[in-house]
Amino acid sequence: MFDYLENEEVALDELKQMLRDRDPNDTRNQFKNNALHAYLFNEHCNNVEVVKLLLDSGTNPLHKNWRQLTPLGEYTNSRHGKVNKDIAMVLLEATGYSNINDFNIFTYMKSKNVDIDLIKVLVEHGFDFSVKCEKHHSVIENYVMTDDPVPEIIDLFIENGCSVIYEDEDDEYGYAYEEYHSQNDDYQPRNCGTVLHLYIISHLYSESDSRSCVNPEVVKCLINHGINPSSIDKNYCTALQYYIKSSHIDIDIVKLLMKGIDNTAYSYIDDLTCCTRGIMADYLNSDYRYNKDVDLDLVKLFLENGKPHGIMCSIVPLWRNDKETISLILKTMNSDVLQHILIEYITFSDIDISLVEYMLEYGAVVNKEAIHGYFKNINIDSYTMKYLLKKEGGDAVNHLDDGEIPIGHLCKSNYGRYNFYTDTYRQGFRDMSYACPILSTINICLPYLKDINMIDKRGETLLHKAVRYNKQSLVSLLLESGSDVNIRSNNGYTCIAIAINESRNIELLNMLLCHKPTLDCVIDSLREISNIVDNAYAIKQCIRYAMIIDDCISSKIPESISKHYNDYIDICNQELNEMKKIIVGGNTMFSLIFTDHGAKIIHRYANNPELRAYYESKQNKIYVEVYDIISNAIVKHNKIHKNIESVDDNTYISNLPYTIKYKIFEQQ
């Protein structure tokens, strides 16, 4: 009988005959099934009268087989494509609905004939809708993933214990935190986001006639029950970001899914692919879009609700591979939006001039804001800078950017990857090749700068910034271009004080001292030195320079410094006084060494006994550079003398007096 019930088309008369001498509750078979189990496992069980007959014959509707399933559980767990409502009702009524939670709601939802009246019966008799399936999805989550969920049934589920608002819905993620801490070690955190995410993702593509695409009524239903469309899943995606991958996109559904999203052009970098992602970015990227062609009406909707930075980030990565689409999008923008996008592009992206040209063609302009933005771009290059300045006219470099000198942004530490400090400079020569991109860019800007000593809101010049950020080649360029070493900032800081206190760079300090700051500037700098012990070498450099200007400076030096460096000051005085006493050809040794005029004529006295004696004594301990200056003068003199002697006797120069010939060759 059991084989007959399980495998054949059951006839009532034949079954009645079998039941006369067979026990329907005989469960000695290997599966511990009773007669109801056997019939309800039959793929052809569609006759409610058979079920009634078995029940009338005393078959126990609450007996559990080897799988711990009652007949109702076996019926709703089996391979049936459809669950017969009448059979389910008979099994429920036979137990007074005590077996109601044996009903497998998850299997039933996958059947092709979900009956709202049967769902209402389950609701009415206390079915536990908080139950979850093996994959830890709730009833409502499973239902929205079925082929064609019905809003009315969704309402029933939600109104009777199926929550769509997770306990952590207020945070940025739409998935339940508690589920990540299941005691089941095999359980993996789900990645599904909200119920709305699940519904959208499971209905992106119409795989068969029976499976519908996304239904706007279902979307409205879920949103009306409190699901926030702006919630994101673990991949940082909203439901809309998935929906735009759909094979059929309804713009009205897009508008529904946009609720709560204040920027449809927001973007982010995907950790796995390193691609720019986001709603608009994904839609424009053919790798994520189902349809080949872009719907411009949809793009316009995203543009209207997107912010310039996100729009820029969404279109720029696709420019090289899809110029046609991007240019079409640029063409649809109004000039104000396009102008904002141009400024964002110039400020934050690696510039492609061909894209800039398209933006200009469609109404954007390279203005002061655009130039100021480019100075903040960490991907700056001299070629693009030259192009932009030519387009704008170059006047933007002369206007402060929110109180800051525009070019000054290039001095900051975020450009530290570029080598301002070159080997050429280490060897004692100024780096004038401008191989560094930032240095080259500044060199391009300088001709447009009307006042190289323009000050920012703090009273600082470009030179202050270059010194502060330890940009030696840039300091050299600015000094060569006329930057004033003596300018004090609003707080009284000089470039010299910054070099000592902040940069702690002796080479920078020596560069500044070589450009002859005033005595007041040096004294003010000494007053600003914060640590007179650790900065001993720098302080001595300032003292030795200041005493060349005024040997009575000791009374002007801050008392704390003069006391600490009194012996050093005395030695400086001794060496300078000695140079002032030595007369060489009507000039003091001091004037030949430390004045501009002396530097031009010292080589003429290379053979002077007083100069030679002083040179050979090597007595200085502080002003030792004097000997290098004299040595260079002797070399120059010998070269001039050699050139004079090599003159052909048959030339007119050979007949000139030696002093005249000397003056001629010293100009070479």
UniProtKB/Swiss-Prot annotation:
Q: Could you tell me which residues belong to the region PRANC/F-box-like? A: 586-666
Alphabetized Pfam families for the sequence? Ank, Ank_2, PRANC
InterPro entries documented for this protein = Ankyrin_rpt, Ankyrin_rpt-contain_sf, Multifunctional_ANK_Repeat, PRANC_domain
Q: Per its UniProt record, what PROSITE patterns does this chain match?
A: ANK_REP_REGION, ANK_REPEAT
Protein origin, superkingdom: Viruses
Instruction: Note whether Repeat occurs among the keywords.
Output: yes
Alphabetized UniProt keyword annotations: ANK repeat, Host-virus interaction, Inhibition of host NF-kappa-B by virus, Modulation of host cell cycle by virus, Modulation of host E3 ubiquitin ligases by virus, Modulation of host ubiquitin pathway by virus, Repeat, Ubl conjugation pathway
Q: Does the keyword Cell membrane apply?
A: no
One of its GO biological process terms is: symbiont-mediated perturbation of host cell cycle progression
Q: Which SMART domains match?
A: ANK
Check the record and name the Gene3D superfamilies matching this protein: Ankyrin repeat-containing domain (1.25.40.20)
Whereabouts are the ANK repeats? 31-64, 101-131, 135-166, 199-231, 235-266, 277-311, 334-368, 458-487, 491-521
The UniProt family comment states: Belongs to the orthopoxvirus OPG023 family.
Q: Quaternary state and partners of this protein?
A: Interacts (via N-terminus) with host RELA. Interacts (via PRANC/F-box-like domain) with the SKP1 component of the host SCF ubiquitin ligase complex.
User: What's the protein name?
Assistant: Ankyrin repeat domain-containing protein OPG023
The gene is OPG023
